[in-house]
Amino acid sequence: KISEEMQIRTVWDEVQEKWYFCINDVIAALTDSKDPAEYFKKIRRRDSELDDFVRGTNCPPHQFIATDGKRHSAKCMDLQSLLRLVQAIPSKKAEPFKRWLAQVGAERIQQMQDPELGIQQSLMDYKRLGYSDNWINQRLKSIEICIYI
């Protein structure tokens, strides 16, 4: 949910075990386009790699209940595909997401260079999610044991 007036429909795919996001909703949230489907077609024409990516099985349709109460099919993307789409959108509304992607990418590369940073990030994430210090310590110990097995 982006705001009270703009929502991105999502669906959990039990088979793939991942979230899918409605492409038209994402485009509507990140652009001023009146026709998100047409905007998506234009982006695909401009970005051949994105078009090739979309032509595969990366954008399966999913059923959503519309405001009229009927079920409608909409093309969706998984998280990785969604992040690729955000990179292709030349809109000021997409810039905060692009900066966030750059920040997360830089942090991940730093964690690969210094694994201790990854452990520290895990600690902060577990605390942010509300886990107790005891639970966090047990979790980190179990991860350490799994690494040595």
Please place each PLM-identified region on the residue numbering.
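An anion-engaging/catalytic patch
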Residues: 1-149
